[in-house]
């Protein structure tokens, strides 16, 4: 199953808010770069009957809104459970705080040996940085470019060389960075899941210390799980600081 990074560029005019270009770059084969100038062709590409792709958008919450708009305007139905899948349906994984994690679109489901679908994830849940910073921090040989984002592009706009180079670098940067992550076996949907999987692999007593709770108990406390975050102050970045301290304090989050 091949994996690609993907990106949309859109008009900023509220009265003509649409995708004027899309781009894809294969992870592990960055010479395979694909682009077009409308969302219809993007969806047609995704619906390849011979292959089910996995895509990564950087900030799926933004691009996903355009995907939803197209699907709902073209006869697709959202379903809550994959067991309900049928032709032209899709599922979503979105948190109660509006965080987008995944979209799965089912194009054809009648063949029991091959369900024609595309799975879309948010690479920002793996690398929570801007594309520009990712290129810098990974020491990539390419960098993010610039275009005039406010310029109006009409329907059918033919991309200039500058625009092609811009969107190509965006998806290629992400493809190169994700390839590095995947080679390090960091393949989960989120970096938090990768961290937990790594911790479980080194703590053989994990299941004894943190047993799976009965459903009723979990349901009672589930709403208290809102997580937290790990942050590195820039003044300490890439510096030896000596011994540190660990604080476990309640009620400091959020």
Predicted feature locations:
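Conserved DEDDh/DEDDy metal-dependent 3′-5′ exonuclease domain
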Residues: 30-159, 165-169
